[in-house]
């Protein structure tokens, strides 16, 4: 489900997305999109996922969320029935006792801390589950709601396939905005001039084309309405005119125009497996990576579903490596001459080889389709031996670097590190990913997050890991960082860890390597599902 927008404005700390004539604004709240009009008396609408049950016609998940809201003292947030329990109600459960709708604004991420609710949604009673409902694709000026939220374990980075019966993508005509949201949007349109229709000077609410997949089109027009109340002059309030449904026929809001597109492929679907993991096939995928992913036009024989998948893969490449390849990642020491797309393919191969979440099978299908479309006189057996050696070296070094930083983090948790008078500055990226590595390391060695740890000790661990990440990301070998840590600790443990991991092979799964893959998956998907949302500092364009 896609919502095009023309400009963005940061107002009261929240990003608002305006349509072309600035007659309507969208904002994100608890994984849902809320649309408000400039025109007095216009329609307010909410677009997003509602929770259902574990099978067709079942509403057990919705009932559970409503009962938990009542139990935790958030009766004011309980929806009137089981048909309109939106994802933002789920977000409220993990947002703290005093949380209101205003606290949920600005992100498509919804935290699920309740293992019972997680069991309903992904069939596993996990904690620290995050549901990613959509993404802001800034380079296309589009907000996208996924057909089904993506479920990620924030502790280890694992992705789960949610129960599709648990979610439906719908829209609802809102009768009012909650009080906290009324305060948020008050005065929003005052600083943004309306652009009138140049042909007839009309200031009517323009149509917004909302693009949905065929699956979503079946449910997106589900419309929740309530009884009539008197009309008032207060915008966005509970006295907003309420429109009674006059028949069983579902009608859309007057600003909505639905356009249907083919269903977008889930490139991370674990049921879609690669047909081979031979190095020669990998080399072919790496060789054609940029043409396959970045080529603007479809080539003959490319299926629509695969063509749509290219856009999703491109977005993931940008999330991991940046628009111009400016974001560092593992494997840089040997992969300097490879493009971001080529290094991305290698990462997907490693994840696929170790049966973690990946999109290598889709890349394989795209490569096969592209090669089949080449002229018959083209020499497709053109992968140089130097490139094959570079691919092998990059894959092995990438897994070894990830393995070393992971085992180092696990070891540092039990070592008494000397305190430093001051800390050198490390990059924001290394700090953020250092925290993620340490969180996963604690889980790996059986340390609970509830065990109290001195803040200075935690900061010390985070500093060492983030500093070492900066060293690796700059292209320095693991060995140099291990030697520095040996001097710092007065111990040979870091160099011993280095020699334990240096023999790892990315092409032959082994027991210790599975722990390394957990770290790789956590860091990779941490970027894929966070970077596209930006840094929250958007300004009007």
From Swiss-Prot:
<keyword id="KW-1035">Host cytoplasm</keyword>
<comment type="function">
    <text>May participate in DNA packaging/capsid maturation events. Promotes efficient incorporation of tegument proteins UL46, UL49, and US3 homologs into virions. May also play a role in capsid transport to the trans-Golgi network (TGN).</text>
</comment>
<protein>
    <recommendedName>
        <fullName>Tegument protein UL21 homolog</fullName>
    </recommendedName>
</protein>
<keyword id="KW-0946">Virion</keyword>
<keyword id="KW-1048">Host nucleus</keyword>
<dbReference type="GO" id="GO:0030430">
    <property type="term" value="C:host cell cytoplasm"/>
</dbReference>
<dbReference type="InterPro" id="IPR004936">
    <property type="entry name" value="Herpes_UL21"/>
</dbReference>
<comment type="subunit">
    <text>Interacts (via C-terminus) with UL16.</text>
</comment>
<comment type="similarity">
    <text>Belongs to the alphaherpesvirinae UL21 protein family.</text>
</comment>
<dbReference type="GO" id="GO:0042025">
    <property type="term" value="C:host cell nucleus"/>
</dbReference>
<dbReference type="GO" id="GO:0019033">
    <property type="term" value="C:viral tegument"/>
</dbReference>
<keyword id="KW-0920">Virion tegument</keyword>
<dbReference type="Pfam" id="PF03252">
    <property type="entry name" value="Herpes_UL21"/>
</dbReference>
């Amino acid at each position: 489900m896609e919502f095009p927008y023309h400009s963005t404005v940061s107002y009261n700390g929240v990003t608002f997305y305006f349509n072309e004539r600035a007659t309507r604004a969208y904002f994100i709240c608890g994984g849902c999109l809320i649309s408000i009009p400039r025109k007095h008396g216009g329609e307010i609408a909410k677009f997003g996922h509602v929770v259902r049950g574990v099978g067709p016609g079942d509403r057990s998940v919705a009932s559970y969320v409503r009962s938990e809201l009542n139990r935790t003292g958030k009766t004011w947030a309980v929806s009137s029935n089981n048909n309109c329990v939106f994802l933002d109600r789920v977000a409220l459960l993990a947002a703290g006792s005093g949380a209101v709708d205003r606290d949920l604004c600005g992100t498509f991420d919804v935290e699920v801390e309740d293992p019972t609710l997680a069991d309903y949604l992904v069939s596993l009673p996990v904690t620290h589950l995050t549901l990613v409902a959509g993404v802001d694709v800034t380079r296309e000026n589009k907000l996208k709601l996924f057909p089904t939220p993506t479920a990620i374990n924030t502790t280890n980075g694992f992705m789960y396939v949610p129960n599709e019966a648990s979610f439906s993508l719908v829209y609802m005509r809102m009768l009012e905005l909650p009080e906290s949201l009324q305060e948020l949007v008050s005065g929003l349109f005052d600083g943004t001039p309306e652009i009138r229709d140049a042909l007839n000077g009309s200031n009517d609410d323009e149509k917004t084309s909302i693009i949905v997949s065929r699956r979503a089109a079946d449910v997106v027009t589900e419309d929740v309405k309530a009884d009539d109340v008197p009309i008032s002059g207060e915008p966005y309030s509970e006295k907003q005119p309420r429109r009674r449904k006059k028949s069983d026929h579902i009608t859309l809001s007057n600003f909505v125009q639905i356009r249907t597109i083919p269903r977008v492929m889930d490139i991370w679907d674990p049921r879609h497996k690669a047909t081979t993991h031979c190095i020669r096939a990998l080399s072919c995928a790496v060789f054609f990576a940029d043409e396959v992913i970045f080529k603007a036009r479809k080539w003959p024989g490319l299926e629509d579903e695969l063509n749509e998948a290219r856009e999703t893969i491109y977005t993931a490449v940008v999330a991991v490596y940046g628009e111009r390849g400016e974001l560092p990642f593992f494997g840089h020491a040997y992969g300097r001459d490879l493009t971001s797309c080529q290094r991305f393919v290698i990462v997907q191969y490693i994840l696929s080889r170790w049966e973690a979440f990946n999109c290598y099978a889709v890349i394989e299908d795209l490569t096969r389709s592209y090669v089949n479309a080449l002229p018959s006189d083209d020499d497709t057996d053109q992968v140089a031996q130097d490139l094959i050696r570079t691919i092998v070296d990059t894959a092995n070094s990438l897994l070894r670097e990830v393995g070393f930083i992971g085992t180092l983090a696990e070891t540092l948790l039990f070592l008494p590190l000397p305190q430093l008078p001051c800390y050198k500055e490390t990059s924001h990226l290394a700090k953020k990913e250092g925290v993620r590595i340490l969180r996963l390391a604690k889980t790996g060695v059986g340390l609970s997050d509830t065990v109290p740890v001195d803040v200075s000790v935690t900061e010390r661990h985070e500093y060492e890991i983030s500093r070492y990440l900066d060293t690796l990301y700059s292209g320095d070998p693991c060995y140099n960082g291990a030697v520095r840590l040996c001097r710092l600790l007065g111990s040979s443990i870091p160099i011993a860890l280095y020699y334990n991991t240096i023999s790892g092979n990315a092409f032959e799964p082994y027991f210790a390597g599975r722990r390394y893959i957990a770290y790789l998956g956590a860091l990779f998907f941490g970027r894929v599902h966070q970077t596209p949302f930006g840094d929250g500092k958007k300004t009007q364009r």
